[in-house]
């Protein structure tokens, strides 16, 4: 069910769609990357330290030390012809494709441009809004921060707006079907294992999310079966997506492995880490891998630079023979049809 708030009587008006994604810097220049890092990392749902400590850490240490290396990575995925990053371009392409189905569709980013506030100011009056976060799984550092920021901006700028928010679609039949269809053609080539790599999160985010949402402590040994925390448990939701993809593809358990990527810092994140498994697989006679990233609906820095490029290099240097990256759903026609189904429920 979608989270609904109705504040006017115009319930019959056709909904305007707002696609929410995480965002990218304005360019790969260091100053733009630094501005993006400051905005992203000072979010209390990303780094959960007290405000002043978080500001000092990010602006005084993390951004000054990371902006150069981050800018170099962003340059590898920058498209000079469109002067944009893949995440932005693909999200806008999704919006254009959905608009062809007869809906009015807008795009906003949690960090960077187009900003939620700017988009809300352009919405037509007297229409209801459906907010579609392009995050299949619930995490405080992705789905939650994007949705709560959007709600805050709606309260501030258009408090009488009627809107609803689409819930995470990690187990939605249409999402699983299009993921499986996206992967299936690659199974015709010989492979040892299909790897499903999800964006990682700090382990303590599981506890913080369940305490905040449900006033519960995240139970030990959870996540393999549904329990009261399932609606806000990122790890459970990724496990569920993996199981459903495996079933849809007709693969045995030993043919599919789930990992987590993009860890930063020294705290404990969800395991197993992709970066460690890339070197280990060849030693385990897993030398031909297919790898997909189901937590990203659009190709982005993390899928292209971290996995398809850097990940392949690590795997090959460790003795891997064949590394096949499976692109994200992006704006494919089947994905647009799946989004229509998700929106209409």
From Swiss-Prot:
**GO terms for molecular function, please?**
ferrochelatase activity; metal ion binding
Q: Which UniProt keywords apply?
A: Cytoplasm, Heme biosynthesis, Iron, Lyase, Metal-binding, Porphyrin biosynthesis
Entry's localization field = Cytoplasm
Superkingdom in the source lineage: Bacteria
Q: Which Gene3D superfamilies match?
A: 3.40.50.1400
GO BP annotations listed: heme biosynthetic process
Which amino acids does the record list as binding Fe cation? 199, 302
Q: Mind telling me which NCBIfam families this protein's record contains?
A: hemH
What is the name of the protein in this document?
Ferrochelatase
Q: Organism, per UniProt?
A: Porphyromonas gingivalis (strain ATCC BAA-308 / W83)
């Amino acid at each position: 069910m979608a989270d609904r708030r109705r504040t006017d009587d115009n319930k019959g008006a056709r909904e305007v769609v707002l696609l929410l994604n995480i965002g990218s810097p304005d360019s790969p220049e260091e100053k733009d990357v630094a501005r993006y890092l400051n905005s992203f990392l000072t979010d209390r749902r990303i780094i959960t330290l007290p405000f002043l400590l978080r500001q000092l850490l990010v602006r005084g240490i993390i951004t000054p030390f990371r902006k150069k290396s981050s800018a170099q990575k962003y340059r590898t995925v920058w498209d000079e012809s469109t002067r944009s990053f893949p995440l932005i371009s693909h999200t806008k392409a999704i919006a254009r494709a959905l608009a062809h189905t007869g809906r009015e569709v807008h795009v906003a980013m949690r960090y960077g441009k187009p900003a939620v506030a700017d988009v809300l100011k352009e919405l037509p009056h007297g229409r209801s809004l459906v907010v579609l976060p392009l995050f299949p799984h619930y995490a405080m550092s992705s789905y939650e921060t994007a949705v709560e920021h959007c709600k805050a901006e709606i309260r501030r700028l258009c408090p009488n707006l009627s809107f609803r928010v689409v819930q995470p679609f990690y187990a939605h039949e249409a999402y699983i079907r299009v993921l499986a269809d996206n992967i299936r053609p690659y199974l015709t080539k010989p492979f040892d294992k299909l790897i499903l790599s999800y964006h990682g999160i700090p382990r303590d985010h599981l506890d913080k999310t369940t305490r905040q949402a449900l006033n519960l402590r995240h139970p030990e040994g959870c996540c393999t079966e549904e329990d009261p925390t399932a609606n806000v448990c990122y790890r459970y939701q990724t496990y569920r997506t993996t199981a459903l993809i495996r079933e849809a593809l007709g693969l045995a358990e030993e043919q599919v492995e789930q990992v987590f990527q993009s860890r930063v810092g020294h705290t404990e994140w969800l395991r197993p880490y992709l970066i460690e498994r890339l070197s280990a697989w060849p030693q385990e006679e897993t030398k031909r891998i297919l790898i997909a990233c189901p937590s990203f609906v659009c190709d982005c820095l993390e899928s292209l630079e971290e996995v398809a490029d850097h990940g392949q290099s690590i795997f090959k240097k460790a003795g891997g023979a064949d590394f096949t990256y499976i692109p994200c759903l992006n704006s494919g026609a089947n994905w647009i049809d799946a989004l229509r189904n998700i929106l209409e429920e």
